[in-house]
Amino acid sequence: MNSIDLSRVHMIGIGGAGMSGVARILLSCGSVVSGSDVKESRPVAALRAMGATIAVGHKAENLAISGSMPTVVVTSFAAIPQDNPELQEARANNIPVIRRSDLLGELMEDHQQVLIAGTHGKTSTTSMAVVALQAAGKDPSFAIGGQLNKAGTNAHDGTGKAFVAEADESDASLLRYKPDIAVVTNIEPDHLDFFKTSEAYFKVFDDFAERVQPGGTLVVCLDDPHAAALGEKFKDRMTVRGYGSPAAAQQYPDVAFTVVEHMEVGPAGTRARITVGDDTVDVIMRIPGHHMVLNACAALTAGVTAGAELERLAAGISDFSGVRRRFEFHGRVSGGAFHDAEVYDDYAHHPTEVTAVLKAARQQQEARGIGRVVVAFQPHLYSRTMEFAAEFAEALSLADHAVILDIFGAREQPVEGVDSRIISDKMTIPVVFEPNFSAVAAQVKKIAQPNDIIVTMGAGSVTLLADEILTALRESE
């Protein structure tokens, strides 16, 4: 950490998933950290407990909130407007302003950098890789976009040589890293509000692969055509290790390294037999879904490449209890009119993610042999909703019943004439469009039956409804 003075850091939007993790590492390293956010939150409270000084609301005077002006100001440019008063104050005082990705890149210097990229599955795969390496005794540093359920944290300053982190492509931040091991889970057009074209989106992954360091390894999912094509493109320039199904491994024999030999879904989870290199292990996944098995393959491949023992990595994967908001179990109704109904919450906000989660929910429902799948979905961003309305409708129709909330605009302004009905009107299952957020739990209760699997889904405020729905269903216990 030589090029940036991190002795006194101020972070705008410090409570965000990515920012709070980096703040944790800075505090562990002895930096004096201050920050601001628009509201109180669990991450803000946790950082205060670690010693950070944090203000709610953005004001110019927040820069000196800890008693001195910062040596550097950190922000997420995608989330923070350029007229933010703290940004303006920093520039007026000639204080360097850097992106969160620049800071993370600085923190990863002198480590073996394990970067997890891809359109979907980054957080789950990164989390599995971390838990696996911990089980293998490697104590990696890490920064994750979600909170590990078991560890209760999203970042750690470890004693091992590996640093595992998500490489976010949404604003091309992944091009600020220097991976020794680069994992690409899948590639599918997204974030077109930033990239404008699919071609520009695909290119950012080519550029990411170009940044793999000499002697490094590119790990790709062979079941995903675009990730597999990336591996094929770079296999003569660096070590490429592919993972996936036996059929995919046969299609790409030159790079196949990790293969799912067998998978069996039961009420207690998913059992998979996985061959990594010349060795085979059995893994029991607590989190359902074929996509989660592929994520486990990515984590095992990265772990072995990082020098860890496969058996110990596999034990860590089998002990993996998930990440907050990734098919996160909120509770079961023990009795009454909705007995044995279960409520889950998931961050899925792209049609492919919705498909994967609902297929996983269906696998779980079929393993139980009873009940239905009910989804309460909140679209995220007007641009994404308009771009993928038909695909969302098809994906959501994998459930048995649905409640569709209005669009969570986040950083975008409303678009006249556009609401979630452009999705719900195309769906082929019973569906209710409910624009009143406070009425959603009641709508779900009207639909619910005993033994149902109910999933709240989306990247916005819908997560607040999981416990509200569970409480409503438990009123009849």
Swiss-Prot record:
GO molecular function: ATP binding; UDP-N-acetylmuramate-L-alanine ligase activity
Domain of life: Bacteria
Transmembrane segments: none
InterPro entries per the UniProt record, alphabetical: Mur-like_cat_sf (IPR036565), Mur_ligase_C (IPR004101), Mur_ligase_C_dom_sf (IPR036615), Mur_ligase_cen (IPR013221), Mur_ligase_N (IPR000713), MurCDEF_pg_biosynth (IPR050061), UDP-N-AcMur_Ala_ligase_MurC (IPR005758)
Annotated metabolic or biological route of this protein: Cell wall biogenesis; peptidoglycan biosynthesis
Main location: cytoplasm
EC number: 6.3.2.8
Gene Ontology biological process terms from the UniProt entry: cell division; cell wall organization; peptidoglycan biosynthetic process; regulation of cell shape
Keyword Signal part of the UniProt annotation: no
Binding site for ATP: 118-124
Annotated Gene Ontology cellular component terms: cytoplasm
Keywords: ATP-binding, Cell cycle, Cell division, Cell shape, Cell wall biogenesis/degradation, Cytoplasm, Ligase, Nucleotide-binding, Peptidoglycan synthesis
Compartments, record wording: Cytoplasm
Main function: Cell wall formation.
Family recorded in the similarity comment: Belongs to the MurCDEF family.
HAMAP family, alphabetized: MurC
PANTHER family named in the record: UDP-N-ACETYLMURAMATE--L-ALANINE LIGASE (PTHR43445:SF3), UDP-N-ACETYLMURAMATE--L-ALANINE LIGASE-RELATED (PTHR43445)
Name listed for the protein in its UniProt record: UDP-N-acetylmuramate--L-alanine ligase
Organism placement in taxonomy: Bacteria, Bacillati, Actinomycetota, Actinomycetes, Mycobacteriales
